[in-house]
Amino acid sequence: MNGDAILTAEGVGKTFGAFRALRDVSVAFPRGRLTSIIGPNGAGKSTFFNVISGALLPSEGRVVFEGRDITGLSQHMLARLGIAKSYQITSLFPRLTALENVRIAAQALVSRFGMWRPRSALPGLVGEATALLEEVGLGQRLGVPAAGLAHGEQRALEIAVALASRPKLLLLDEPTAGMSPEETRAIMELIARLATERTVVLVEHKMKLVMNISDRVVVLHHGEVLAEGTPDEIRANDEVKRVYLGQGRPAVARAR
């Protein structure tokens, strides 16, 4: 099952009181591929994302990264190991510039307590931050405060902040939430470019976007894995069409 998986979830379950959000979820995420997690509302996508990203402790099962059991490790330790994430809700420093936000993230990698050291004490960080901002399309917005960026630009900045930790694995939770169609196209093109050099796991509810850029797709339903495979395999899966797409062939066509 695992092959050259960089991350695996093994028999993961999660309960909240009497409610079972995840049940025996086992998924292997291939190294160097873009894997998307989809499913209808209430499928358990966000809960699963929070478990594999270290924000939630599973009630059962474990999460393994590069052969190491990382279940229960702090998010700081996960970042040190090479896992970075970006959530639906931005967590930027709104009054700091785009460059300062990314520079601080890069500085935090150098030392756990080094976020506020003088910039001069950590040579090269400004250049590194500038390069990351250019990579995500914000090379002309270095001096703009995060609060002054458009929503799509803020999401791109979030991704640059995540990349500042030099991750082996990038986890993205609904990066297009609240975006205009133009912003959505831009951010998905960015993610597709990033995935050519990194392993990316993407939670996204927009089927068309997922099918167009993913190498593999995992479908969750009622907290369980309903199906997984290539986009074409998911399009052709009758169970997926029944519980998620809802309208058979026309819905699959729209997902292309």
Functional labels for PLM-detected ranges:
Residues N2-R256:
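Glycine-rich phosphate-binding loops of nucleotide-dependent enzymes
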